Amino acid sequence: VAGTNPLVALFSTVSLGFMAAAFGGRPGVMSGASGACSVVVAALAASHGTGYLSACVILAGMLQCLSGALDLGKFIRLVPHPVMLGFVNGLAVVMTRAQLSHFMDGSGKLLLNTQGYIMWGLTALTMALIKLIPKVTTKLPPSLGAIFVVGSLVKLLKIPAVTLASIAGADTFTGGLSVIPKLRLPAVPVSLATLKTIFPYAAVMAAVGLIESLLTVQLVDGMLDDGKKGSTKKECIGQGIGNIFSGILGGQGGCALVGQSIINVESGG
């Protein structure tokens, strides 16, 4: 979505996730490259290149750190519970619709052929394992266990399943570690014109990222009955540091992720 190499996006998730977890305000919250943030900066990346994208991410991180220093995150508690439920349910609908496209052909019709039946079957098996694994052991995250079992079956039995390479292209991950950018400031002119170009995108990205992150903190607070409340101030600063670090590495930034945080908490993370 943001116009970066998939490996860069993955590394961006690793760097952002590590820094946000280290400096954030709530254990259990998972952060990474976010579709919501990527949509905001996609136009900037397309028109000015990835250098301006990285500069935008760094500036967004600075704005998030400033929001944390001013303790602006506390206002997220004014969001009523029904709004938070609508946010989570809406996200579930969006995620489901995004996944359903992989079960359709080019004309938008469901795949009702051999390939489709294999995909439906593997999906059903994965969902069943996610429910069954916790009944057998609690030491293995059910989602990870299901992926490992189903992936192993596909490999061992040579099941002709659709893979990421077959959808995105065989050369999607070509380049390996050499594709990952080095730690350096983005190569953009340090001028008022550059600031005028990236500031509107950075401000929106910072706001969208903090809203999703702080709502995720509230959601995790409700799921974990440990008597603790996440610190909105620390979460703002943690997200900001994560985005600054991600931008310096040439990443696309991101925020806390509701779906991944739910999976993490339910898996005992």
Region locations from a protein language model:
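Transmembrane helical cores of multi-pass ion-transport proteins
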Residues: V1-G269
